[in-house]
Regions:
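A membrane-topology feature that recognizes alpha-helical transmembrane segments
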Residues: 1-197
Length: 197
């Protein structure tokens, strides 16, 4: 039963990921659909050893993500995923999801470095891993993908209407829900191999 709930959750995450990659906006109803399978998994797992550690860690992570400027969808997704039981008391579910997402984000960072090394913008080494050099036209056409300037909260970001110069250095708006979907797929694979505690 937990495997079926996990696959249902992954299907919803897949659709949310599609929306996140395409527009960087996820419909509220899609995020709401993450909770029925997660709550059912929580109900079935409540008595598992140290189960409560996963939801607690998930809520702490969700709060930390929101306080550091991540979008509401990212925070709510990690909160929902944390309701799934850990396959090991030593590895709460959100830790596995974040680890898997981190591997995916590392791949994105390497991709950004390779792209930026061939583009004309002057960037620090750190920026080459976290930002992207794009043409003015691309930045204006797909403003949902690129964050220009200092932004503390992505929910309140308003793209500029004009950009000076032919190229601009922008923070790449990482679709973190898509990375979490890959992290949750890793969790499901490990859960299938190891099984419940």
């Amino acid at each position: 039963m937990l495997e079926a709930l996990g696959l249902a959750e992954l299907a919803v995450l897949g659709f949310a990921s599609y929306q996140d990659v395409k527009t960087r906006e996820i419909d509220v109803w899609v995020i709401a659909l993450l909770f029925p399978p997660a709550l059912a998994a929580a109900y079935l797992s409540w008595s598992a050893p140290l189960y409560i550690m996963s939801p607690i860690l998930g809520l702490v992570l969700a709060l930390a993500m929101r306080l550091t400027g991540s979008g509401y969808a990212d925070s709510l997704a990690i909160a929902a995923l944390s309701l799934f039981p850990p396959f090991s008391p030593a590895l709460p579910t959100p830790a596995v999801v974040v680890l898997g997402a981190g591997i995916s984000v590392l791949g994105t960072s390497i991709w950004l470095l390779l792209i930026n090394n061939r583009r004309p913008c002057r960037m620090t080494l750190t920026q080459k891993f976290t930002h992207i050099c794009v043409t003015r036209e691309e930045a204006l056409k797909r403003s949902h993908r690129y964050i220009i300037g200092e932004v503390r909260d992505v929910e309140k970001y308003k793209p500029p209407e004009r950009i000076e110069g032919d190229y601009v250095v922008a923070r790449y708006g990482v679709p973190y829900v898509a990375h979490m979907a890959l992290g949750f797929a890793l969790y499901l694979a490990l859960y299938g191999l190891v099984g419940p505690p």
